[in-house]
Amino acid sequence: EMCIRDSVFTDYVDDDYLKSFNETAKQFNTSIIVYLIDPKYFADLPTSQFWSYATYFRVLSFEYLSESISTLLYLDADVVCKGSLKPLTEIIFKDEFAAVIPDNDSTQEACAKRLNIPEMNGRYFNAGVIYVNLKKWHEANLTPYLLKLLRGETKYGSLKYLDQDALNIAFNMNNIYLGKDFDTIYTLKNELHDRSHRKFQQTITDKTVLIHYTGITKPWHSWAGYPSASYFNIAREQSPWKKYPLKEARTVAEMQKQYKHLFAHGEYIKGITSLIKYKLKK
């Protein structure tokens, strides 16, 4: 039986959250270590409309944990486990930096062209799911180079996808490449164009291991009540976190998505109310 230790890197935690983490650890017979991060350490690094400073928790986790463990399965917060992770435990690293999953085909070509690395087309990975060889990471001492990349101090200039670009450049395609079942990218925006709400089954299949919910609308939003989000809800209902309500829209971008999805659900009065709030906030 494999021993698992979970690590959570966050910039916010309170007593209720810590209590829920403790309850989760007891329920699933695991250990959960919570690392509280001060955002000031990322003040000189770039952010964007879609990428906040929280994206740098990824590199921080690699650097910090490489002092004590040899491998790490990193998951973005919007990744949900649907299948068995056992195949990852059977990976034996040689000199590779990580086991990764190629990004969507359209992203592949665009990123290879943008970074002027033609051979990266087909091997540019999505950083939402990375099984990292921390022993190799530690030996290579990558963090100083990554910081230069992130600050735009290399020939690559400013990076559109921030640390995802930087990791792709630094790893230089020295990776084990896995099938997309380990990072099945799905956006709930698709539901706005699929009134049957069943087409997701063409993407999320019986073979899918990890679902990566990209985009503004996440499964934990109150307006995301679709069958495609059920995998998150199943996990939520089996955990202490079910006591917390689903998230409401707070940002302008979330409000815009909320009213559109409410209309898709046929909740027209709520949708109109949400639309008015969006217009006023905008």
Spans of features found by a protein language model:
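Short, surface-exposed amphipathic charged segments that create phosphate/polyanion-binding patches used
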Residues: 45-54, 112-117, 192-197
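GT-A fold catalytic core of metal-dependent nucleotide-sugar glycosyltransferases
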Residues: 34-40, 54-109, 124-132, 138-140
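A short acidic, often aromatic-flanked loop/helix-cap motif at beta-alpha or helix-coil junctions
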Residues: 38-45, 106, 183-187
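A short, conserved beta-to-alpha structural element at the edge of catalytic cores
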Residues: 98-119, 221, 225-229, 241, ...
